[in-house]
Amino acid sequence: MIDHLGFRVTDYARSLAFYKAVLAPLGYGLVMEVTPEMTGKDAHHAGFGKGKPDFWIGNGGDATRNGLHVALQAPDRAAVDAFYQAALAAGARDNGAPGLRSHYHPNYYGAFVIDPDGHNIEAVCHAPE
């Protein structure tokens, strides 16, 4: 059910070098970097994995407060939409309405909310429509 997770870091370059070194023995490598130019946000992100990025680090914001991001797999885009509406109805704050995020890949359809404790929770579907 967990698709990927990520957290904020205080020094992106230092953490990038650290995780490249410590994840390599586990067979994990750097799969993707997301730059401010790709997203329009002032943050860098690095996704590590075995072919698919499922372990993410990123800068931007306060790394010591509510820096957790968890993405849950959805079976289809309708489930992503339903997750988003249910989360808002339950008191979550919007952090990205359902939609394509083609800077990750062409079929990446996700929605983001901030839970009551400030964590960034996402539902994502990777299947084509």
What are these regions (language model features)?
Residues I114-E129:
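Short, contiguous alpha-helical
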Residues T10-R14, A71-P116:
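Vicinal oxygen chelate
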Residues R8-K52:
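Core segments of cupin and vicinal oxygen chelate
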Residues M1, A63-N66, H105:
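Short glycine-enriched loop/turn motifs at secondary-structure junctions
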Residues M38-A82:
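Long, continuous compositionally biased terminal/linker segments
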Residues P36, G60-G61, L100, H126:
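Residue-level structural signal for beta-strand termini and adjacent loop
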Residues M1-L16, V70, A127-E129:
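N-terminal beta-strand motif that seeds the catalytic metal site of vicinal oxygen chelate
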